[in-house]
Amino acid sequence: MKFTALLAGAAVALTAGFASAETRITYKSAKSTSSYYQMAVQIAEAMKEGSGGDIIVTVEESQGSVQNVMEARARGGDYVFTTPPVLVRLAQGGKAMFEGKGDPKFDEIRALFPIPSLTMHFVMGADSGVNDFADLEGKTVLIGKGSFGAREGAKYLGLFGLEGKVTLADVELSNAVPALKNGQIDGFVTAGSFPAPNVIEAAASTGVKVLSLSDEQIKQTKRAKLVIPAGTYAGQTEDITTTSLPVVAFTTTAMSDEAAYQLTKTYWEQKDAMGAAAAWWNGVDSDLMQHITGKIHPGAAKYYKEIGWALTDAQM
């Protein structure tokens, strides 16, 4: 009887030990059809694999980054979400889409790690005769509707003196490749982590030229400079210089230091394996840390200090 009781006690202790070791995370991502949702699923799988099952991530669909930030007001210590850092700054300042929606909880948002950036692609048909932005005049271009890429594409046309000089095709971005194939458009604009699936398809099926931006044009956009290496797309013999909007995984101060440490450590240790399965992870490296302009969670900061990565005063 005593032996049975001891076994039962040991079983309870073991169960308690496993329960305390397991970290459950809710990861708020993007629309289920987006590349960022695919990334979230890949992160969930990598966390489970890298932690031996101790980190369990549940991916939640989202309508976008603004929703992700807004939900930080009410979520607990298990909440991780993705957004460009600029939206966190706007939320904390009660500006733009967050005007009149300020909340002290926004000041508790903390960064964990960068994920692949939103990368601008101006994709032109190989036979369109377009080699730079000046050549876009008189052409028909699809920029889509309502997305970051559509807003950014329209903004760039205005900045570069092309507003009203380019015909904007009334076609959904999902139909960009067929429209390019049948000559309905001369090119399209898309924003997504490289290599972008629709650009891969277009490059392989019809041949394309992805336009580069000059340093002066990049300065005009007020976005980060990003280089897409030669060979990323079929027929691409030179680097493409373009712009990007950094995207970061955030949590809040409600998350424990240990959970933030383990999440960050496992993410970076699994990044190469993720990159072997999906090339967009290969563009993530320590250089992206400079785009985290706000505070980093103390648990994540502990990991970065361990591996010798310098953090700025603003990040601490």
Segments the model singles out, each with a brief description of its role:
Residues I115-V130, A224-I228, L245-A259:
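A bilobed periplasmic-binding-protein/Venus flytrap-type ligand-binding module shared by bacterial periplasmic
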Residues N175, K181-N182, G192-E201, S205, ...:
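An extracytoplasmic/periplasmic, membrane-proximal ligand-sensing/linker region
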Residues M1-L7:
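Bacterial N-terminal signal peptides that target proteins for export
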Residues Y79-P116:
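Acidic, polar ligand-binding/catalytic clefts
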Residues Q38-R73, G235-T237:
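Extracytoplasmic small-molecule ligand-binding "clamshell" domains
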Residues P84-P85, G93-A96, K101-G102, G164-A254:
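Pocket-lining segment of extracytoplasmic ligand-binding domains
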Residues R24-G50, I55-I56, P114-N182, S286, ...:
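Bilobed "Venus flytrap"/periplasmic-binding protein-like clamshell domains
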Residues T15-A21:
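Sec/Tat signal peptide C-region and signal peptidase I cleavage site
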